Amino acid sequence: PRSTHCISSAASDVYKRQIDTAHGHTKKVGDAIKKIKKLRPKKTAICAGNIATEEGAKFLVGLGVDIIKVGIGPGSICTTRLVAGIGVPQLSAILNVKKGIGKSKTRLIADGGIKFSGDIAKALAAGADAVMIGSLFAGTDEAPGKKIKKNGKLYKYFRGMGSIGAMNKGSADRYFQSKQKDTSKYVAEGVEGYIKYKGGVDKIIYNLSLIHI
């Protein structure tokens, strides 16, 4: 699984470490968490995922993670459910994981499936503490990629983490394919494409901020 870390701003001395993989309920993930907990500074927050089941939540909570990422295949350009035949509707996944978390203080992030502002409200109402958004922000000035003009309209390139393009840039380990030396044999679980240019992200954030629960 991919492991990333960062040090927060000077206002806080808490370290963050993330275990990021397409299937977070595995022995490899468990071993990685145990290793980090053994080596980490005392003030280190661990985020792990992704999962979609009550059992997966109990597994990660039992290992002492602070944050769990929820979502197997809900992304707009993710093809895991088609390629691997595995996935759980995002709202059901959030409810499952929330049940598994129980009374522990572990936080829940809904990763994917946010296509409209109402999806944020549903995710939070179901038990998520935060959401991760990709496609809604894709095509904005702040998103990576150059603007391209096609048939008189502006577009921006974007891709899923499981796409061949992303795997060639380092995301293959997230899908357990890092040992595959022949990149032509990568099995994609995401696609690449173009999305209509949307301008500044501030307009989108303003519309999303009007949600009240």
Q: Where do the PLM segments sit?
A:
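Single conserved hydrophobic/aromatic residue that forms the stacking wall/gate
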Residues: 1-11, 15, 212
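Gly-rich Lys/Arg/Thr-decorated short loops/hinges at beta-loop-alpha junctions or inter-strand turns
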Residues: 13-16, 74-82
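Active-site glycine- and acidic-residue-rich loops that bind
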Residues: 28, 46-57, 112-117
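Catalytic beta/alpha-barrel core
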Residues: 16-25, 45-50, 71, 87
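Alpha/beta catalytic cores of nucleotide-metabolism and tRNA/nucleoside-modifying enzymes
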Residues: 62-66, 85-110, 114-211
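Short, ordered loop/turn segments at secondary-structure junctions
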Residues: 21-24, 51-53, 72-75, 113-114, ...
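Active-site-adjacent beta->alpha loops and helix N-cap segments on the catalytic face
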Residues: 22-40, 54-58, 77-95, 145
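Short beta-strand/loop segments at the ligand-binding rim of alpha/beta enzyme cores
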Residues: 39-52, 101-111
